[in-house]
């Protein structure tokens, strides 16, 4: 079947990944020992998208965990589903990348990368028909960003025709963990533009906002944030794992969402999100889901879709619902908010419906949108990058690992190009010549 190899790198990637496996295991009825305790055959029908079957009927995640220091992996191992993973698939160094992209990409990471690739190869060879790779990592640190992008380019070389999908946590505007985030993020984006097929962009601040505003949590933990991300991650692939009326997979998603090869950075959202107390006061209907899904407050990255236009979007519905109603709602959204969709791609929302809803919900929807507003996020990182780079602040940490200033300049200009490409398509109209003719006729 259509298998996916999951790779998680660095502290952030491993924490999101661990949460993701909790969510997926729950959906498929698999307990922390890998034994199946489900209630429906559908849970096992395509379980091999994410799991290998081991002896004695145990299900083992097709996951590869990598990091340059043992800390996070130890906590994953000690976590609720830690015994689920295959011990050989933990690949870690001892030194750490120290939030330094160059260490992850060129020195420390480069030493470890071959052992990671061995595990990737082993997992890929065991697949029947490999659909692609999904990677969870952050762009602000050293391992997830530096080594993560190194891995992406190596895997790309070896499997050029497989889909490479990343869930990338971008440094958020107000919350900063490390001073050199803008450097690490810019160098990473430079790689992702060239080597990844689809990047789902997430940022902590937007996730915090969702937790405060919508879920009404007073003190959200990283666990809460990661749970939001996992819900969306599980939605992106649910069509591969469960039967549905309108199926979608990673490749269909890519074909429908990417009008130009470089513009593959997506915003994701998930609905319904309600605070625990107000759940019973809401009816879940397709119109209600659609409304929340397109709400700017629902986006998991700090860019406001109302400041740009959607090139394309995809709605992945889950649950029993009428296809007709979904189609009507999608048309409705496009007609009512036509100014937020580029008019030179007609019908630019793809929808798919999967019959099995997530645990505890009657219906849900995952939203993936390709909006030109995401340039706000790149602009923000670029400004911070330029401010430091102009003074060559902190550069010695990178040049000391053998990097060249030239590489920084290239990454900076690549990111600026990306921003202006988004802007160009935001301003483009369907018939630029056509407008003048109409004026003449009046």
UniProtKB/Swiss-Prot annotation:
Single GO biological process annotation from the record: mitotic cell cycle
SMART domains, per database record: Tubulin, Tubulin_C
Compartment(s) where it occurs, according to its Swiss-Prot or TrEMBL record: Cytoplasm, Cytoskeleton
Gene Ontology MF term list: GTP binding; GTPase activity; metal ion binding; structural constituent of cytoskeleton
GO annotations of cellular component type: cytoplasm; microtubule
Functional note: Tubulin is the major constituent of microtubules, a cylinder consisting of laterally associated linear protofilaments composed of alpha- and beta-tubulin heterodimers. Microtubules grow by the addition of GTP-tubulin dimers to the microtubule end, where a stabilizing cap forms. Below the cap, tubulin dimers are in GDP-bound state, owing to GTPase activity of alpha-tubulin.
Superkingdom of the source species: Eukaryota
Entry binding sites for Mg(2+): 69
Entry similarity comment: Belongs to the tubulin family.
A Pfam family matched in the record: Tubulin
Lineage, opening ranks: Eukaryota, Sar, Alveolata, Ciliophora, Intramacronucleata
Cofactor: Mg(2+)
Main subcellular location: cytoplasm
PANTHER family, per database record: TUBULIN
Gene name of the encoded protein: bPT2
Keywords: Cytoplasm, Cytoskeleton, GTP-binding, Magnesium, Metal-binding, Microtubule, Nucleotide-binding
Transmembrane segments: none
Quaternary assembly: Dimer of alpha and beta chains. A typical microtubule is a hollow water-filled tube with an outer diameter of 25 nm and an inner diameter of 15 nM. Alpha-beta heterodimers associate head-to-tail to form protofilaments running lengthwise along the microtubule wall with the beta-tubulin subunit facing the microtubule plus end conferring a structural polarity. Microtubules usually have 13 protofilaments but different protofilament numbers can be found in some organisms and specialized cells.
Protein name (database record): Tubulin beta chain
Residue numbers binding GTP: 11, 69, 138, 142-144, 204, 226
């Amino acid at each position: 079947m259509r298998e996916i190899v999951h790779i998680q790198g660095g502290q952030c990637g491993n924490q999101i990944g661990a949460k993701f496996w909790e969510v997926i295991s729950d959906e498929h009825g698999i307990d922390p020992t890998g034994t199946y305790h489900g209630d429906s055959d559908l849970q096992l029908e395509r379980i091999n998208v994410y799991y290998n079957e081991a002896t004695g009927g145990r299900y083992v995640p097709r996951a590869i965990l990598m990091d340059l220091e043992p800390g996070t992996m130890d906590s994953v191992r000690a976590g609720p589903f830690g015994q689920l993973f295959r011990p050989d698939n933990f690949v870690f160094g001892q030194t750490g990348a120290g939030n330094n992209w160059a260490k992850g990409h060129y020195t420390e990471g480069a030493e470890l990368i071959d052992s990671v690739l061995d595990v990737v190869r082993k997992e890929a060879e065991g697949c029947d028909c490999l659909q692609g790779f999904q990677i969870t990592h952050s762009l602000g640190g050293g391992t997830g960003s530096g080594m993560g992008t190194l891995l992406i380019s190596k895997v790309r070389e070896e499997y050029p025709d497989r889909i490479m999908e990343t869930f990338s946590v971008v440094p958020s505007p107000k919350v900063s963990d490390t001073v050199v985030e803008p450097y690490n993020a810019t160098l990473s984006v430079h790689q992702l533009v060239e080597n990844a097929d689809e990047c789902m962009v997430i940022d902590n601040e937007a996730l915090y906002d969702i937790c405060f505003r919508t879920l009404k949590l007073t003190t959200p933990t990283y666990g809460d944030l990661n749970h939001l991300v996992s819900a969306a991650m599980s939605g992106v692939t649910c069509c591969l794992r469960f039967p549905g009326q309108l199926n979608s997979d990673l490749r269909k998603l890519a074909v429908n969402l990417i009008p130009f090869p470089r513009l593959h950075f997506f915003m994701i959202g998930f609905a319904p999100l309600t605070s625990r107390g107000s759940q019973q006061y809401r009816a879940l209907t397709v119109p209600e889901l659609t409304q929340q899904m397109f709400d700017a407050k629902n986006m998991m990255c700090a860019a406001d879709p109302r400041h740009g236009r959607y090139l394309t979007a995809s709605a992945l519905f889950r649950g029993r619902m009428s296809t007709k109603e979904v189609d009507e709602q999608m048309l409705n959204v496009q007609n009512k908010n036509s100014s937020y969709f580029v008019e030179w791609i007609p019908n630019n929302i793809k929808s798919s419906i999967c019959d099995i809803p997530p645990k505890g919900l009657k219906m849900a929807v995952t939203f993936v949108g390709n909006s030109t507003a995401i340039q706000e996020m790149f602009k923000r990182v670029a400004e911070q990058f330029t401010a430091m780079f102009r003074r060559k602040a902190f550069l010695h940490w990178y040049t000391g690992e053998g990097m060249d200033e030239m590489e920084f300049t290239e990454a900076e200009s690549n990111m600026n190009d990306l921003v202006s490409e988004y802007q160009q398509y935001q301003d483009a109209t369907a018939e630029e010549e056509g407008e003048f003719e109409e004026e003449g006729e009046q």
